């Protein structure tokens, strides 16, 4: 279901993760810690998904959207999600978060050096210094894929 191009688009871009309450009230959040596990599953790292986690307890039907403007590719993935808080998948989420957050900090530190606006520099510095600890891995079992571009 997921080909190599889709996997690369997921890894390189911010994704938008949609959940809903049992009665259908939607919630969408941006997610940067995303990694395809195999050809049918996608891992998201939960560092601050409070409302999303509550929604998943009520309704595990989800969608994940991503756009790569450089490659002119966009996809929507629909499926069922589960929350994992221990074991191999969770440990993989922790490792992914550590690797990606290190890269993120380095990028933000370079931006601080080049930023001329003092207020923006302060905001970027605050974001760079945040410590985000993974709370869980969210695993999406992909059932449908829709190309959007």
What are the residue ranges of the model-derived segments?
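A short mixed-secondary-structure module that forms the rim of ligand-binding clefts
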Residues: 33-72
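Structured loops at beta-to-helix junctions and adjacent beta-edge loops in soluble globular domains
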Residues: 20, 67, 141-143
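Short beta-strand segments
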Residues: 27-29, 73-77
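Charged, gly/pro-rich active-site loop segments
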Residues: 75-149
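A generic local secondary-structure boundary/capping motif
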Residues: 5-7, 53, 125-130
């Amino acid at each position: 279901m997921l080909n190599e191009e889709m996997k690369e688009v997921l890894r390189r871009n911010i994704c938008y993760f949609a959940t809903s309450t049992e009665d259908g009230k939607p919630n969408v959040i941006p997610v940067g810690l995303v990694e395809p596990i195999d050809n049918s599953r996608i891992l998201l790292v939960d560092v601050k998904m409070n409302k999303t986690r509550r929604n998943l307890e009520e309704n595990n039907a989800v969608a994940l959207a991503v756009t790569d403007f450089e490659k002119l590719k966009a996809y929507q993935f629909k499926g069922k999600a589960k929350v994992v808080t221990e074991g191999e998948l969770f440990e993989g989420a922790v490792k992914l978060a550590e690797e990606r957050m290190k890269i993120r900090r380095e990028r933000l530190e370079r931006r601080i050096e080049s930023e001329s606006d003092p207020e923006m520099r302060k905001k970027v510095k605050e974001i760079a210094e945040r410590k985000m600890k993974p709370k869980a891995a969210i695993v999406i079992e992909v059932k449908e894929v829709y190309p959007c571009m």
